[in-house]
Amino acid sequence: MDATLEQFINYIDNSARDKLENDDGVPEEADVADTYSQFYTAFAGIFPVSKQCDKDDIVRRLVEKYCSELTIKKKLGFEFKDEDSHPWLSEAEDSIEWFYWNRYRRYLVRDKKWAPAAVKSIDRDSRNILDLMANPLECGSFTRRGLVVASVQSGKTANYIGLISRAADAGYRIIIVMAGVHNVLRNQTQARLEDGFTGFNIENSTVEPVGVGKGSQARRPIACTSREADFSTERAKALRCIQPTQTNEPFLFVVKKNSKSLQQVIEWLDASNSQDQPLLLIDDEADNASINGKYKLEKRENEPTKINGQIRNLLNLFNKACYVGYTATPFANVLIDPSVDSDEYGKDLFPSNFIYTLEESSDYFGAKKVFGDYDEPTHKHLRFIDDADDVLPAKHKSSFEPFMLPLSLKAAIRTFVLATTIKTLRFGTNFHSTMMVNVSPYTL
């Protein structure tokens, strides 16, 4: 697509989405069409390329896409909380400037073209989770521990970026995201947070606006890590010129669950006298590496695993600290002994204050939709293949190599290519299409 034409269409789409998102209720298709038509007319005078366009065709395509998104539904998450939880946000939010949250919301609507229901669910859920945390500006000290549970690949990262944005607006000043145990996952999470929260990418000593930063850089957080590197002694030296006590903007760390990385963060925060700054610690995949694997019921005061102890020490550095774990498999987390409280490490990471479950959207395609559940099994989406036994026997050695592809697999590949082509023609190229072929346990 011509760059000018693409810009013209994006202006129409973004402006229409902004208006429709701010209207109350679910719009009728006729109202959606009128809105898109009005913005087409408004921008046509600015873009000469419009003279070469078919207005009806462009408006129809945009309206079809937007209305298809309106069919996606998502319920509000469900919360379990302790008796000491006291809602605080309703009373405080009139004094909060939602700069980071509004910027992130605008990014989801305009740039990511998220369905209205998906954006509204992140809006509501992130607000509810923040309300379960403590008011960072309240007098005195607090420590809160919570857990957010969601299905695999259902939007956990997008949700905690929304929570981080809201928390930064509310007054949390130190934000740490522990993103897995491998560099690949940490780098991916860093990139997502740059797009959705910081708005810039530091690479090769240059600062490039990305994501939310392309729309507004009136304010920006202090990025303590980059896509190139985890927190290190070199990065700590570079941050000497600015301390958390010298700015009202939040500091963001995206680190691996690695004892060396965590120790360097702990030492830098301890040296920077940050103990009075409110801390939000996000533990992504909270059931991985964070659990104290050395725990024994008969020895509750035993030495914890290295990473578990460091996470607890990190929380203990601050007078105001909130730990929020995110996971799709919470079994280990809810089985943590809630009574553990050692002199050296403090309480363990049991989510003693709240658990919040994120609901799946109606278009989420997961294991339950494929297989059903125990009471209502389903094979609606399964196709049983019976032409592959001669090509790839069920029992085979790891060295086995098939001599040809089954006709069913060839048909499936052709179908995937055709379906992807149709989707591209209808909606453009901003969609991922994936096909996984896994016919042997040795090739997973």
Show where each model-derived region lies.
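Low-complexity, highly charged intrinsically disordered N-terminal segments
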Residues: 20-141, 183, 187-248, 254-276, ...
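Pre-Walker A (Motif I) flank of P-loop NTPase domains
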Residues: 141-148, 173-174, 249-251, 431-435
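Walker A/P-loop
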Residues: 142-160
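P-loop (Walker A) phosphate-binding loop of NTP-binding proteins
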Residues: 151-152, 180, 440
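Walker A/P-loop NTP-binding motif
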Residues: 157-171, 192
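Short helix/loop capping segments that flank catalytic or ligand/cofactor-binding pockets
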Residues: 157-161, 186-187, 262-264, 290-291, ...
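Conserved SF1/SF2 helicase motif Ia
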Residues: 167-185
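Conserved P-loop NTPase catalytic core
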Residues: 204-211, 277-283, 287, 293-426, ...
